[in-house]
Curated annotation (Swiss-Prot):
Entries under InterPro entries matching the protein: Elong-fact-P_C, NA-bd_OB-fold, Rib_uL2_dom2, Transl_elong_fac_P/YeiP, Transl_elong_KOW-like, Transl_elong_p-like_YeiP, Transl_elong_P/YeiP_cen, Transl_elong_P/YeiP_CS
CDD domains linked to this entry: S1_EF-P_repeat_1, S1_EF-P_repeat_2
UniProt GO molecular function: translation elongation factor activity
GO biological process: peptide biosynthetic process
GO cellular component term, pick one: cytoplasm
Protein name according to UniProt: Elongation factor P-like protein
NCBIfam families per record: PRK00529.1, PRK04542.1, yeiP
PROSITE patterns: EFP
PANTHER family: ELONGATION FACTOR P, TRANSLATION ELONGATION FACTOR KOW-LIKE DOMAIN-CONTAINING PROTEIN
Length: 188
């Protein structure tokens, strides 16, 4: 798979090891004919050793085939997250550092999660496109605020903060895009 096609969460082979991509920085230097470079922050699977590497857009990194198991978030065990396989009820435990910032989207009983498994070991989670979270704290709407589309900060039930439209109030359930971390609409 070419470096410019790789997304966060992909698992690739690099230097004889298997790594999961956690962060991507794209840079296009002006002086070198505009060759786009990608800097990947990746962690070894299993083990979680951090590696930082840069690639040209057309560099090839072989993608590793993983087993994806549809699961439901079950509970938190200390700092670890436990997911239950929807088919055979196998529990998959992932440490908080593997979950990373995605922890802000995970609520009790969240469904539609895929746990990525290599050699019977869970290595990552793939969240649904949107999740429903509750607004626990946001400033009140200003009078006449409907004429403008100013966003305001809102704290969600998972502790995460996002910007929401002015008409959203405390206690409302909102959809949040798990890729961008942005407000995606009201939940029913």
């Amino acid at each position: 798979m070419k470096a410019n096609d790789i997304k966060k969460g992909n698992v690739v082979e690099y230097n004889g090891g298997i790594y999961q991509i956690r962060d991507i920085e794209r840079s296009s230097p002006q002086g070198r004919g505009g060759n786009v470079r990608f800097r990947f922050i990746m962690y070894s699977v299993p083990g979680g050793v951090k590696t930082d590497a840069s690639f040209d857009a057309d560099d090839n990194l072989p993608e590793v085939e993983l087993l994806r198991r549809q699961s439901t978030f079950s509970y938190k065990d200390g700092e670890a997250f436990v997911f239950m396989d929807d088919e055979d009820f196998t529990p998959y435990t992932l440490d908080a550092d593997v979950i990373g910032t995605d922890a802000g989207y995970i609520t009790d009983g969240l469904t539609g999660i895929y746990v990525q498994v290599i050699d019977e070991q869970p290595v990552a989670v793939q969240l649904p496109q949107t999740v429903t979270l509750e607004v626990v704290e946001t400033p009140p709407e200003l009078k006449g605020g409907t004429a403008t589309k100013r966003p305001k900060p809102a704290k969600l039930n998972t502790g995460m903060e996002i910007m929401v439209p002015e008409y959203i109030t405390n206690g409302e359930r909102v959809l949040v895009n798990t890729t961008t971390g942005e407000f995606a609409g009201r939940a029913d």
